[in-house]
Structures are given as C-alpha cells and as structure tokens.
C-alpha cells in the first residue's frame, strides 16, 4: 500500500487512531512494522499514534516482544456503555420466549434499595388466574423468588442489613420470617442456581426465579416464571430450571 502523507487534519488523525484500535482489536497484538505496513503509514506516525494510545491507557506494549495490544480500559468502556443499555430492550425477547415455553406469567424486576420494582410483566397464556403483581409495584425482597435470587448474590452482612431494615411479616403460612432459615434458603439458591417462591407471597402461587448477570459486579435484575401450584408442580419447576 502506498505511504500516505503526513497531515495535521484533526479528522484524519482521529481516523488513524481508530484504525489502530480496530487493528489491535482484530489481531490481538502487533509489532510497529506490521501496523505501519498494514495502514500504509510511516513508522514514526504509527509510533506517535501508539504512544498516544498508551498515554491515554487504551494500549500497552509487551516489554519482551515489543508488540502492542489493547488494554482492559477498552473493556471497561464497553461495559459502561452496555450497562446503560435499556434492560427491557435486551430482555424482552427472552421473556417472551419464556412465556411461550411455559405458558405462565413472566416477570422482570430490578432492585430498588431493600425492595424490588416490577418493570415488566407478561400475563399467563393459560388459565384465568391473575396475580396481584403489576408493573410499577414495589415489593420486599424476603418473600419473593426474584428477591431471594438477588439476595443470594449478596454478602451475608448486606443480607442481614436488608432483613433488619425490612418489615418482616407473614404474607402466607409459608412466608419465611426467621433470618437463620432465610440464610439456609439462600445457600440452597446459590447451590441450585435459582430461587423458589413456594406460596410465600401469594397462596396457591409458586414461582421460580433467577438473576440476570450483567457487565457490572452488582446484580440489579431478576426474572421469574409464576403460576398456580396446580400447574407449577415440583416436577414442572425442575423442568423449567434446566
């Protein structure tokens, strides 16, 4: 490729920076001469571009091979962009798929302090039972499958803090109101990979729930499949958990 002439055009300079970024992203690591040849730029120009990327923290040089590669700052930047992506835009197709497979009500919630907020719901496709849950509803964590799924990702100290700051009351005869029992249940959730609401919030309603793990360390979202115990049998729950 013919060598391009130097220019002070800021647009072209930016273009070259991104060309180097894209090339390193594609190849993993490259030497100065490789990049220079591929882009058709003088070695001094490429070296200056690489030094700029290293200075800004987007690239690094292997001291042994002298080759250049991208740093994890790029990954961090991508993660921040993805965190801001509308969760519903990502989750809706999967929630609809779960609804089609199960025929039951499907919920998506996000954590709001010590509570959960329902942000999306698909009603059951079978039967006439309608649960009290609805979009915009705020609910305590301790007596729901989605809440327990989120709590299971938290350290014990934070779980106990949520518990102590919540009003713990019996919603049904099966609601867990003992912290030691809850800690045992959360351990089972971690082991199984899903949480169960076994008529703890509404009599006659059983839910299976799991977290949505994103690009940040903090788990903010969880989803559930909920239905009457006559359809959400133990066997059915195990099938849906697979």
Would you name each region that the model predicts?
Residues 65, 69-165:
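Amphipathic alpha-helical effector-binding/dimerization core
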Residues 57, 118-120, 221:
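A structural microfeature
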Residues 174-242:
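Extended hydrophobic
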């Amino acid at each position: 490729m013919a060598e391009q002439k130097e220019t002070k055009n800021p647009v072209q300079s930016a273009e070259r920076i991104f060309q180097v970024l894209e090339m390193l992203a594609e190849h993993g690591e490259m030497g100065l001469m490789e990049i220079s040849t591929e882009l058709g730029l003088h070695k001094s120009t490429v070296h200056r571009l690489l030094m700029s990327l290293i200075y800004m923290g987007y690239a690094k040089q292997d001291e042994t091979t002298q080759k250049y590669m991208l740093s994890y700052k790029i990954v961090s930047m991508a993660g921040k962009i993805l965190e801001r992506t509308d969760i519903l835009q990502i989750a809706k197709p999967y929630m609809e798929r779960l609804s089609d497979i199960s025929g039951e009500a499907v919920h998506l919630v996000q954590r709001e302090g010590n509570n959960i907020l329902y942000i999306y719901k698909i009603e059951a496709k079978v039967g006439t039972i309608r649960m009290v849950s609805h979009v915009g509803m705020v609910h305590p964590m301790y007596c729901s499958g989605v809440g327990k799924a989120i709590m299971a990702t938290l350290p014990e100290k934070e779980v106990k803090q949520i518990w102590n700051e919540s009003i713990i009351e019996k919603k049904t005869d099966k609601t867990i109101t003992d912290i030691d029992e809850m800690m045992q249940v959360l351990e089972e959730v971690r082991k199984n990979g899903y949480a169960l609401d076994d008529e703890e919030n509404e009599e006659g309603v059983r839910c299976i729930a799991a977290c949505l793990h994103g690009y940040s360390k903090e788990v903010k979202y969880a989803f559930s499949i909920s239905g009457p115990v006559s359809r959400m049998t133990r066997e059915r729950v195990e099938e849906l958990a697979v």
